[in-house]
From Swiss-Prot:
Lineage, highest ranks first: Bacteria, Pseudomonadati, Pseudomonadota, Alphaproteobacteria, Rickettsiales
NCBIfam families xrefs: glmM
Protein name: Phosphoglucosamine mutase
GO terms assigned for molecular function: magnesium ion binding; phosphoglucosamine mutase activity; phosphomannomutase activity
Top-rank taxon, per record: Bacteria
Annotated CDD domains: GlmM
Cofactor binding summary note: Binds 1 Mg(2+) ion per subunit.
Organism expressing this protein natively: Anaplasma marginale (strain St. Maries)
Signal peptide residues on this chain, from the entry's feature table: none
EC number: 5.4.2.10
Residue numbers binding Mg(2+): 98, 239, 241, 243
């Protein structure tokens, strides 16, 4: 069974592959590769309770291979990608399961340039996790040391603020920030406050168990309510490792990643500073025509931050993102950074002198239903059983410029099912019929239906 998915290693904490023995061996495998480049690895994490175990196991493996480890503590994923470059480290490692609950944990790995490691290196690491590495252990004199990196939070805050136009301030703007009780709990509000905003922070009291629990980008209802209560100009919800952002406007209407990307594309195109952008297969079909109208070449990648970055690099894209809220601004970041993306949105509001609802109102996503379906039987077996029904669905949706996406998640045991088309009634009808068929086949019903 492969331990790497679409975004590093992820699974239930204390269960393979996130058990201490496997994580220790992963640390050794990472150390074996890192020492080919240098002697330092930086290591950050989010706030889930299992992070202590995972951190200890990884550190043991790394120092045993002769690698020094700089501990960052709770920090956003993008902060590690930034600091690995600034500190000239061999690799950066993040302990996080992103938007998953506290029950899970994971490991993401960045190279010395702050880019997620390629598939080929993942395969090497996977092989070495299973290999006998005792002969590769460092001599006692050459074992690594562990130290805490002082001032890392301040460094990252200054980096994020540096992506905001120097002539602008957030004075007079009221912002609600939901930090998801995650890695940005001590950073999210500080960034906007230091730039002059009146900030209302929620989801900033992590206890190791409440990360992403009824808060953050997956559960933005609290943010929406707080925006309406406070009369705020905008709401910004992060996830557990602050690599995705979900926004609501001053009217409490939610804005997804596609709308954020569309707004950024429109603004950058008006300044002639963008020719190419990238999204994944999960993005709305209507964003393609929107980009064409702007004169922007839009490229699509497979789902996942690494695939998106590969596409952006190949086509020299200025901006890229996923509907889920991962936004990459290549001028500033090598991975998705929710705080940098949020400042980009705020700068557009100020430069165009418009409200949040105005800057997002230009792009209308195609009607869709998105269902996350838990499953227990083998996915390939499910795909074979549901195949004829999917063919019928695709044929029906073809009449309304629609499509169906039926794929397994690379980070959770869920099937991602998306039905979209220009006729919302047909989309809803097809989604219901597909759900009925899945129940008949013994697959569990979808959870958290979303109609846009």
């Amino acid at each position: 069974m492969n331990i790497f998915g679409t975004d590093g290693v992820r699974g239930r904490a204390n269960v393979y592959p996130m058990d201490p023995i496997t994580v220790l061996r992963l640390g050794m495998a990472i150390g074996l590769e890192a020492r080919k480049v240098g002697t330092q690895v930086v290591l950050g994490k989010d706030t889930r309770i299992s992070g202590y175990m995972v951190e200890s196991a990884l550190v043991s493996g790394l120092v045993a291979m002769g690698v020094n480890v700089g501990l960052l503590g709770p920090m956003p994923t993008a902060a590690i990608a930034t600091l690995v470059r600034n500190l000239r480290a061999s690799m950066g490692v993040v302990i996080s399961a992103s938007h998953n609950s506290y029950l899970d944990n994971g490991v993401k790995i960045f190279d010395s340039e702050g880019i997620k490691i390629p598939l080929e290196l993942e395969e090497v690491l996977e092989s070495n996790v299973r290999a006998e590495l005792s002969s590769d252990l460092a001599q006692v004199r050459g074992m690594g040391k562990v130290y805490r990196i002082a001032g890392a939070v301040g460094r990252y805050i200054e980096f994020v603020k540096g992506t905001f136009p120097k002539r602008l301030k957030l004075s007079g703007m009221k912002i609600v920030v939901d930090c998801a009780n995650g890695a940005a709990y001590h950073i999210g509000g500080e960034v906007f406050w230091e730039l002059g905003a009146d900030v209302v922070v929620i989801g900033n009291k992590p206890d190791g168990l409440n990360i992403n629990h009824n808060c953050g980008s997956l559960h933005p209802e609290g943010m929406v309510q707080k925006v309406l209560e406070e009369g705020a100009d905008i709401g910004i919800a992060l996830d557990g490792d602050a690599d995705r952002v979900v926004v609501c406007d001053e009217k409490g209407r939610l804005v997804d990643g596609d709308q954020v990307i569309a707004s950024i594309m429109r603004h950058l195109r008006a300044t002639k500073s963008i020719t190419d952008a990238a999204v994944t297969t999960m993005s709305s079909k209507s964003i393609d025509s929107y980009a064409r109208e702007l004169g922007v070449r839009l490229h699509r990648s497979e789902v996942g931050d690494r695939h998106l970055v590969d596409t952006m690099r190949r086509h020299s894209c200025s901006v890229g993102g996923e509907k889920s809220g991962h936004i990459i601004l290549w001028e500033h970041s090598t991975t998705s950074d929710s705080l940098v993306a949020a400042l980009q949105i705020l700068s557009i509001m100020l430069l165009e002198n418009k409200s949040a609802s105005s800057i997002f109102g230009d792009f209308v996503p195609m009607p869709r239903v998105h269902r996350d379906i838990p499953y227990s039987m083998e996915f390939d077996h499910i795909a074979r059983l549901i195949g004829p029904t999917l063919s019928d669905v695709e044929q029906a949706l073809g009449r309304v410029n629609g499509r169906v996406i039926f794929r397994r998640s690379g980070t959770e045991r869920l099937i991602r099912c998306v039905i979209e088309g220009e006729d919302p009634k047909l989309v809803a009808l097809v989604a219901d019929e597909l759900s009925i068929k899945l129940r008949e086949l013994g697959v569990e019903n979808g959870v958290e239906p979303e109609m846009q």
